[in-house]
Structures are given as C-alpha cells and as structure tokens.
Design a protein with these regions (language model features):
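Short intrinsically disordered, low-complexity coil segments enriched in acidic
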Residues: 1-5, 213, 231
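Amphipathic alpha-helical segments of the small helical/lid subdomains adjacent to P-loop NTPase cores
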Residues: 1-23
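Extended alpha-helical interface modules used as scaffolds for assembling large macromolecular complexes
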Residues: 16, 21-223, 227-229
C-alpha cells in the first residue's frame, strides 16, 4: 500500500518502487521518499494549463489506451505525461470495452503529489499544508466543527486571483484534495437514492455531509440534505 501498486500491463504482476523500498530499509522507517527524486513542477503547470479535473486522478479515471500512450506533452491531455512519469499506473482493465482504469499506484505517490499540489490551487504554502491537515484531523475527530470550518476558509478565501473562477467545481476540487490528504474515508459527490451530496466524510465517531452553495444559504443547503435523503 505504501510503495507497491505499479502495473504496466493489465495482467502484469504488481511492482514495488525500488528507490522507496531501499530508502525505507536504510532508514528503518516507512517514510515518503518518492519526492527526493524531484518535484513535479512541470506536471502541475501542465495540469493548470489544461484545467484538468484533479478528482479524476484521485478517484481513478477510465480511458482508452490511446489516451495515455502518446509521447507528447499536450495541454489538452496531460494524462500521458502523468502516466509516463510514474504518478499514475494501471489499476484495472475492462476487456469488454477496452477501457483502462488509471490511478495513483500507492499512498506515497498519492499523498506526496497532492500535498505538492495544494499551493498551486490555494495560497497555503507547501510547508503549511501538513500543519493544517493535522489540525483538520484533530478537529474532525474531536467534533469541533466550528474550528474545522474556520480553518477550511483559509483554503477557500486564499484562492489566487487567476484561479478564482467562482464555480462550485473548483472549490470542490480543493475540498476533495484536502480530505484525500487527511486519509479519511472520503467520497465526493456521493449519490443517494434521491440525489447526491457534494461530499460525505466518515470519521470513527461521526458522519459529516457537505453541500456546497456559492449563491445559496446554509438553510437552503440543510433543507436539500434533508429532502434528498443524503443521510
């Protein structure tokens, strides 16, 4: 889970990242060593230019082989470069429709990449991200919702001007990234029998349902949660 998960063929045997495994043995600690080989600045810039939905990488994206087998870096399709750089790998294959599922190979790559991504979508620096994530974890586990919401505003209110497109999707991407970093059981836009909630977060002691409203009120969001049966 930490260092394995690489597959280069639908029927291929899973492979470990040898660099990370060797470093873990040397340090006698299950750390995050992937980013010692370099930071994906170019890839993140490519993602920004293409306006690629980061949630697809987090949840796993289904594509044809042609979607990730190109060797050119194109802003309209950053997936080949992301795949060839080792940040996503083959996670599944449906032979009936010839669709591949691509996703992060393991937790080391997932959390390392998303942690590096935060400053590109918010004004929260890379050094500050870990601090806020730790605080988020404490606040949700203790049920301190007010403190959690105040801290979440730091990520939303500090969105750089050139990225502030005032769409629910953009804010939801930030939220999705934050909670993936938390390592919580997290699903975005979870569908229920009568609709879908924007986000549902499960902790050991509580379930939090989030409904995003840029132009609406909190009362309207709560009413929608009740009426559509998100709980």
């Amino acid at each position: 889970r930490q260092y394995d998960g690489y597959h280069f063929h639908p029927e291929g045997v899973g492979m470990f990242n040898p660099f990370s495994v060797l470093n873990a043995f040397d340090a006698e600690e299950m750390g995050y060593y992937w980013f010692q080989t370099g930071t994906p600045t170019y890839l993140v810039d490519l993602l920004k230019q293409s306006d690629y939905d980061i949630r697809l990488l987090i949840d796993g994206v289904e594509v044809l082989a042609s979607a990730f087998s190109e060797y050119r870096a194109e802003t309209n399709n950053p997936l080949p470069m992301i795949y060839q750089s080792g940040y996503v790998t083959i996670k599944g294959y449906d032979d009936d429709v010839k669709l591949y599922t691509l996703g992060f190979p393991n937790d080391e790559v997932r959390y390392g990449f998303l942690n590096f991504l935060v400053p590109y979508y918010t004004n929260v620096s890379n050094d500050e991200t870990g601090f806020h994530i730790a605080k988020f974890m404490r606040e949700l586990k203790s049920g301190d919702v007010e403190a959690f919401m105040e801290r979440l505003k730091i990520f939303f209110s500090g969105i750089p001007y050139e990225l502030s497109d005032d769409t629910e999707c953009h804010y939801q991407v930030i939220f999705h990234v934050v909670f993936t970093l938390l390592g919580q059981f997290f699903r975005s836009e979870v569908r229920s029998s009568r609709g879908r909630a924007d986000a549902v977060v499960h902790t050991p002691t509580a379930i939090y349902v989030f409904e995003f409203k840029l132009d609406g009120t909190a009362d309207a969001a709560l009413k929608q949660i009740d009426e559509k049966g998100y709980l």
